[in-house]
Amino acid sequence: MDFRIIARDASCHARRGRLRTAHGTFDTPVFMPVGTQASVKSLSPDELEDLGAHIILGNTYHLLLRPGAERVARLGGLHRFMHWNRSILTDSGGFQVFSLARINRIEEDGVVFQSHIDGARHAITPETSMECQMQLGSDIAMCFDECTAYPVTYEYARESMLRTVRWAARSKEAHTLPEQSLFGIVQGGVFCDLRRDCLERLVETGFDGYALGSLSVGESKEEMLSVLEAVAPGLPAASPRYVMGVGTPEDLVEGVRCGVDMFDCVMPTRNARNGMLFTVRGGIQIKNSRYADDDRPIEEGCSCYTCRRFSRAYLRHLFLARELLAYRLNTLHNLHYYLGLMAAMREAIEANAFDRWRRSFYLDRENREPAEE
């Protein structure tokens, strides 16, 4: 992996970079569409590439349970399995274990849990997480960590953070695939001193990149922003900085302001399937009756396939009729919006105009459409 900073904005910590993996180069800050089960829901790999996606995320937990990492390896690895020739980042499985599965035990060795699919009992340790991610063959792997819940006491957050640090060291020791980069994950809940302590310890171990985990897990926006502002700028400047599972367009803008390079979130794809579509002025719920006779596209001037061809009225009809095309068209638009948002921020940073761009971004959102019915 090679990561280089191309430009910095003088008004804040925002930075424009370029990251090269074994499967290509992409510009940062970047948004990674989530391909939970070796698929970004409703879209083909060719469509993702046409949208301008250069890296996607795969979920180790889901792929471990079905179809199994060993099977994916036998079939040539995740890139070949899903016919995606660009970069892939896999998470460690930690977040899904703590959010989806029924946990039986958290031990020093790892986590024993029951599958959310069939109730079968499994265990994930730092070593098995690394083995799975190496079998999948992603370009970037994540250390196995404990996803700290919210709310927790300071004492538990510290205990959890220290366990994550120990698991990170074991993850690094077990990781033996040279062409696959390994990122450490900074934990500590909403306690900024614990986050800084965790970061110091991870830097001592040494990783190719560093991520902030366990954000947007129930804490307030103010608490999340406080952690971002206090910790993100202190992540090693020469390494990629990643905030996991975040978030809204506003979250991405504030993350970039704080110096974050990489983001992933299910929001654009999940919201698309629920009929919530993103525009520069905010979100619209396409099922609302006000769009029944609306002949306009989702967003005037949007160049996505959906907006160039279809009206809000048609999209509303498809959604209410539960036509599969609704999910595809909505997803195409939402990912086009998210990827375009990142491109606009990269351009603003390169022009040393991020602060002005950010003010314009929020001004547009103040001019929302009238309240929906």
From Swiss-Prot:
GO cellular component: cytosol
Pathway annotation: tRNA modification; tRNA-queuosine biosynthesis
Binding sites annotated in the UniProt record for Zn(2+): 302, 304, 307, 333
Binding annotation for substrate: 91-95, 145, 187
Chain positions covered by the region annotation RNA binding: 245-251, 269-273
Cofactor detail note: Binds 1 zinc ion per subunit.
Listed EC numbers: 2.4.2.29
Catalytic activity from the UniProt record: 7-aminomethyl-7-carbaguanine + guanosine(34) in tRNA = 7-aminomethyl-7-carbaguanosine(34) in tRNA + guanine
A Pfam family assignment: TGT
Highest taxon in the source lineage: Bacteria
GO terms, biological process: queuosine biosynthetic process; tRNA wobble guanine modification; tRNA-guanine transglycosylation
GO MF annotations, alphabetized: metal ion binding; tRNA-guanosine(34) queuine transglycosylase activity
Keyword annotations: Glycosyltransferase, Metal-binding, Queuosine biosynthesis, Transferase, tRNA processing, Zinc
Broad EC category: transferase
HAMAP family for the chain: Q_tRNA_Tgt
Family, similarity comment: Belongs to the queuine tRNA-ribosyltransferase family.
Function: Catalyzes the base-exchange of a guanine (G) residue with the queuine precursor 7-aminomethyl-7-deazaguanine (PreQ1) at position 34 (anticodon wobble position) in tRNAs with GU(N) anticodons (tRNA-Asp, -Asn, -His and -Tyr). Catalysis occurs through a double-displacement mechanism. The nucleophile active site attacks the C1' of nucleotide 34 to detach the guanine base from the RNA, forming a covalent enzyme-RNA intermediate. The proton acceptor active site deprotonates the incoming PreQ1, allowing a nucleophilic attack on the C1' of the ribose to form the product.
PANTHER family, alphabetized: QUEUINE TRNA-RIBOSYLTRANSFERASE (PTHR46499:SF1)
Protein name: Queuine tRNA-ribosyltransferase
Organism: Syntrophobacter fumaroxidans (strain DSM 10017 / MPOB)
